[in-house]
């Protein structure tokens, strides 16, 4: 009967019925769908519609449906205004009465002016929990975790976005990401509509955790463009704290180990299960999750109410078997891969560009004098700038600079002005930490030397090293009270800021600690291996097992990951470790090379017996030499284009970094001899500008001419500057997709015009403007052997285009010019047309996607009548029409050397196509005219089926 009444009301204007009658007719519908009675009672009390006695009567009802019926009885008995207010509460508190949204929409309820003035209090558990989460995340993300615990930096004042790049499944560049909001939107960079995980990856220290902290801060303050009502943040390394016997329900994981609802947790969890799309999860550092727990022994799916091991819950959350539809943002270091079916987007963090670095310097040093002093020192040392491209290292260097300013107030604080290694940076920050408790006023200035500082802090450093080594050995990054006590760390040591305390996360109570960054743990691990006299040479070198030869199985890794492909949607646990990233081992090796370098011996002799130091140094060098020979010999080689090409892998970059840390010319010469090729391919290795310092250190000893391919990396202008020692021997220089600006091109111009040996210059997809185009033109003018020039997808307009075209016209060696994806327009096209006339060498020209109209097309067609060298011209994605087609048809009746004419995605119709087809009757040289994507209908294209050289579809 009541159900019939409900349907009877559908589509009937509310004004025709009283509010009391509406509640009567829909009584059972309301009884069924109202879950939260307390919120109704609270609002009726707040506005004086219910007395305390009314509230007690409702509370005395034994079941929720009985409570709803009693509220309805009381509301209806109090008249129209109270009934209308009752409906107003249902309308305003959408989360509390989500099941009534459709019904409220159907009845077209609109409150009167009187009712709109009434106060609505939201005591709904779901809404309260959202506010609780916002408060907690806002508090947790307010301060940037600083390397000295006594200092807190406001995140709002120190955070800066880094270069964020959308990439495809195979890490191909899809363009830059506009900002953090774009991470979660549904229109930018989506690879898989069914995927739920946004995967953010990048090298250690590039800012992944800071990005998540900023995301939390924005969500907590309501500034994030997201509909998420719940935000759960987990650090993957914390899951390593759980024992194999630990069992948790999903509700316990979310509430007891993150944030427990202040009221009605069952109601909150029920809402989350019903509407998982209202939740956003962030999982930080998947590569830092290591456990012996075997997920292959447990079912693929699990029930949200049944207890399971926390790693099972994590795996099923990531795979979507739990809370399917919830948004997930996952971070990991470069090298970790996630199954495609889970991915929604992939975002690569690139670190600071030169402009980011200068902006960050201004933010960290608002005082003008200090700011200018710092920037002058950075400009004088590209090597230091390259290190600062990694936000973590930049922050450490800047904080050390600030410390020197404070300690030596009134004097000029100075950053190193020579080659700086990562070991130098971490020794510096160690010295700063240890000197924090020392007097720093002008009256009591601390004058201890670095050696004295380290000697005074020997006990602390050794204890920290013991903690770090124990964790690194097991790939663990969180330490309990027992590990800290076993190393004899004292309370004062913990206050120095190397270790920071964490909130309780495991099932057992007790304080946990972590180093402020993985790289610091690696540094102290290396320090322990060098300084502890009980460490054997075998143990000293054990992390070098990560230096596997290309093609070797990864089973020799120091520690295998707990994760299997099965848990994330793959088929088998067997085979290579899907999470091969072992940067903590690689950084340990790097710091070992740095600490045992000749330059550090005087410092370390204060701490380590001379004989032990000599023995360890000898063992490291012997192993380093043997590893280098073996690895370089095993690199894949191929004969291509007249070159003996060697394709280096990312491990080769780690070797270069270790060699650079030694600052040993002997090791550099050995590595250079081992290359044994004249073409070194380092494309897609995620090399950064600092790696160019290491590469130059080795190639400086390579005395033959060399082709160098560094396409698709992250070098920027600082990287180009660091390559300066190499340019005297580089004949092929491929620097495409590297964030290079006009500043970097200027360096190239200055260097390449000195030696004039370059034959190939690749600068595709950078940030070069007309200014840089002029430098490129100068290179082409002065380097008479330059044959291949790739300048596509930059920011070059007609002015820059004319400069390049003039240089092409004057060149007798150039054979291939790529200008795709610029904006040279008709003026630029006319300049290239002039260059084409009677050109002696040019065979391939791409002017695709350049805004060229029929006017520019006509000039090019006319010029080709006077050209006998060009065989390929690409004019794809311009604005050419039938008039242009007619001009090219006339050209084809004269030109008998052109082989490929690409006019794809222009505005040519069947009429223009017919003219081109007729011209082919008098041209036997051309092999194809590509017209795909023009204004030609399929039925019109059939006319040209017999002419195989016309390609319409």
Swiss-Prot record:
Tissues in which the protein is found: Although ubiquitously expressed, NOD1 levels are more abundant in immune cells, the gastrointestinal tract, and adipose tissue.
**Boundaries of each CARD domain copy?**
15-107
As for subcellular location, the record says: Cell membrane; Apical cell membrane; Basolateral cell membrane; Cytoplasm
Annotated positions binding ATP = 202-209
Q: What is its main location?
A: membrane
Q: What happens when the gene is disrupted?
A: No visible phenotype in absence of infection. Mice however show impaired cytokine secretion in response to bacterial infection: macrophages do not secrete cytokines in response to synthetic gamma-D-glutamyl-meso-diaminopimelic acid (iE-DAP) and do not prime the lipopolysaccharide response. Deletion mutant mice show a normal glucose tolerance but the level of circulating insulin after glucose infusion was significantly lower than in wild-type mice. Mice lacking Nod1 and Nod2 are protected from high-fat diet-induced inflammation, lipid accumulation, and peripheral insulin intolerance.
Task: Cite the Pfam families for this sequence.
Answer: CARD, LRR_6, NACHT, NLRC4_HD2, NOD2_WH
Which GO terms fall under molecular function for this chain's record? ATP binding; CARD domain binding; identical protein binding; pattern recognition receptor activity; peptidoglycan binding; protein homodimerization activity; protein-containing complex binding; ubiquitin binding
Q: Where are the LRR repeats?
A: 702-725, 727-750, 755-778, 783-806, 839-862, 867-890, 895-918, 923-946
Q: Which InterPro entries match?
A: CARD, DEATH-like_dom_sf, Leu-rich_rpt, LRR_dom_sf, NACHT_NTPase, NLR, NLRP_HD2, NOD1/2_WH
Return the similarity comment.
Belongs to the NOD1-NOD2 family.
* Role, per record: Pattern recognition receptor (PRR) that detects bacterial peptidoglycan fragments and other danger signals and thus participates in both innate and adaptive immune responses. Specifically recognizes and binds gamma-D-glutamyl-meso-diaminopimelic acid (iE-DAP), a dipeptide present in peptidoglycan of Gram-negative bacteria. Preferentially binds iE-DAP in tetrapeptide-containing muropeptides (MurNAc-TetraDAP or TetraDAP). Ligand binding triggers oligomerization that facilitates the binding and subsequent activation of the proximal adapter receptor-interacting RIPK2.
> Subunit structure, briefly?
Homooligomer: homooligomerizes following ligand-binding, promoting RIPK2 recruitment. Interacts (via CARD domain) with RIPK2 (via CARD domain). Following RIPK2 recruitment, RIPK2 homooligomerizes via its CARD domain and forms long filaments named RIPosomes. Interacts (via CARD domain) with ubiquitin; inhibiting interaction with RIPK2. Interacts with ARHGEF2. Interacts with NLRP10 and recruits it to the cell membrane following invasive bacterial infection. Interacts with IFIH1; this interaction promotes transcription of antiviral genes and inhibition of viral replication.
Know the name of this protein? Answer: Nucleotide-binding oligomerization domain-containing protein 1
> Which species is this record about?
Mus musculus
**Gene name of this polypeptide:** Nod1
